[in-house]
Amino acid sequence: MQLAFVLYKYFPYGGLQRDFMRIALECQRRGHAIRVYTPIWEGAVPPGFDVRVAPIKAFHNHRRNEKFSAWLAADLARDPVDRVVGFNKMPGLDVYYAADGCYEDKAQTLRNPLYRLFKRYRHFAEYERAVFAPAAHTEILMISEVQQPLFVKH
């Protein structure tokens, strides 16, 4: 199978990044072809990996994420894969590795209500729903049992 792994930034020392690398290398060892999509790649590329760095720029993270998602969708339409595995919340994933906590829970409980009026909030809430909404049909790999009820609640 051709697998696409998607993450917003790869650098060799992050926890999410180490999890991604471990999983991708194991999939490769089992005979799958590995393609990686990211706007930022720092470090060596493992032999056999097809790393595609998105040529995008934006001042705000949420705008960069939107541009990256559009670029990713266009590239996958031109050159499809069997499964898309994401390590950050975004539309179009077949599988999501839940390394981050529930954004909506943090926005509702830890932020001022005015926070929810801003584009940044709307973006991240929408991307979380794109993964966790029942209509999304995304397979979720939870690494924290504590977070699961929060995702279900929101």
What is each stretch, according to the model?
Residues 1-3:
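Extreme N-terminal starter segment of soluble prokaryotic enzymes
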Residues 15-22:
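Conserved alpha-helical elements of sugar-nucleotide-dependent glycosyltransferases
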Residues 58-84, 121-130:
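An amphipathic, basic-hydrophobic alpha-helix
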Residues 120-143, 148-149:
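Membrane-proximal helix-turn-helix segments that form the acceptor-binding/catalytic region
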